[in-house]
């Protein structure tokens, strides 16, 4: 009943109005899985390739008809008749057929959309919710937890048209008893933040990930206005709610220095920028920093890990790009202590699960993440619960492309009840 009988690829639109790949996998017995590939703005240089057409007369060159043709042609032909329950086998067929290190032949956007659609179809054929099927694929059947959200309520960097260098300022409602209550707390802080910004005459337009994108006097001012909003919402900063940042430092790394426009174009060395961040962690309860240096600055990361790694979570995104080869090297060299998991960085569900397992086995945490270009596809919610990853980054409390994931988590928590505990602060590296 789980034999693949039809595969369909199509071009749809993402949350930025750009095309992306959606795939359907149909099985015997009428079971269907459908999934769409997300797309990033600040991307690591070693990510799997997102195949775009480059035809400037169509979607400004961002069309994905070549990737869609790969789904409807060679990929479909290769997996028709195969057993959808063999996820590793299906993914291997596509990866081998593509034949490149970075999936540049078919595009990671094509392979991932089919990979996820296949998992959804297989789950349906087994009569299981997607998170339960993922737990089985992960070798951890029935082991679930609800993730602590990192809610990106102030957007800067590549995600917003403002003067803030650091790309994401996030809140984590660690004091909540459940995921649903964490979402409520996040929503309340989000609305109070709008009031705080308006009272200061600041813009409350939102960026790609649904957070506000005001012009601020400095990067520290973003933390200050969030602290004000947390207090106004009736919560205690550091106890009920902790803070996290994604520096996306590769975006302001120029000629070996970190140049911050929000700090008067000041240029920092790796060590100086590490201490700039350390000072912020002393002023505010920041418990997680992502991509605190450039992806190629491994010596700098070793220093940053030495200075901050036993106090807070240091997450590698552009640094590790969900790639087990790069992560393995990072673990061996003691670089960071956590990995951001974006399945389009590597391009298949099987490889994503391998990265999560490698991280956990090494004592690193794994933070499941959206991309800045998203769709209504909420697979990452099921991935977070099904792997018991413990943390999720899926944007702010606005834009349906972000909220779709929170709503799916609320549904899953309702279905699982006490089977999926919300562990709060304990999930964050260095905070247990």
Curated annotation (Swiss-Prot):
Required cofactor names: Mg(2+)
Keyword Transcription regulation appears in the UniProt entry: no
Superkingdom to which the source organism belongs: Bacteria
Active site: 209 (proton donor), 342 (proton acceptor)
Predominant place of localization: cytoplasm
Pathway(s) where this gene product acts: Carbohydrate degradation; glycolysis; pyruvate from D-glyceraldehyde 3-phosphate: step 4/5
GO cellular component: cell surface; extracellular region; phosphopyruvate hydratase complex
Catalytic activity: (2R)-2-phosphoglycerate = phosphoenolpyruvate + H2O
EC number, as in UniProt: 4.2.1.11
PROSITE patterns (alphabetical): ENOLASE
Cofactor detail note: Binds a second Mg(2+) ion via substrate during catalysis.
Chain sites annotated for binding (2R)-2-phosphoglycerate: 167, 342, 371-372, 393
UniProt record, GO biological process: glycolytic process
Cellular compartment(s): Cytoplasm; Secreted; Cell surface
GO MF, one example: magnesium ion binding
Residues binding Mg(2+), per UniProt: 246, 290, 317
SMART domains: Enolase_C, Enolase_N
Keyword match Cytoplasm: yes
Disulfide bonds: none
Described function: Catalyzes the reversible conversion of 2-phosphoglycerate (2-PG) into phosphoenolpyruvate (PEP). It is essential for the degradation of carbohydrates via glycolysis.
Protein family (similarity comment): Belongs to the enolase family.
Subunit structure comment from the entry: Component of the RNA degradosome, a multiprotein complex involved in RNA processing and mRNA degradation.
Protein name: Enolase
Native source species: Klebsiella pneumoniae (strain 342)
Source species taxonomy: Bacteria, Pseudomonadati, Pseudomonadota, Gammaproteobacteria, Enterobacterales
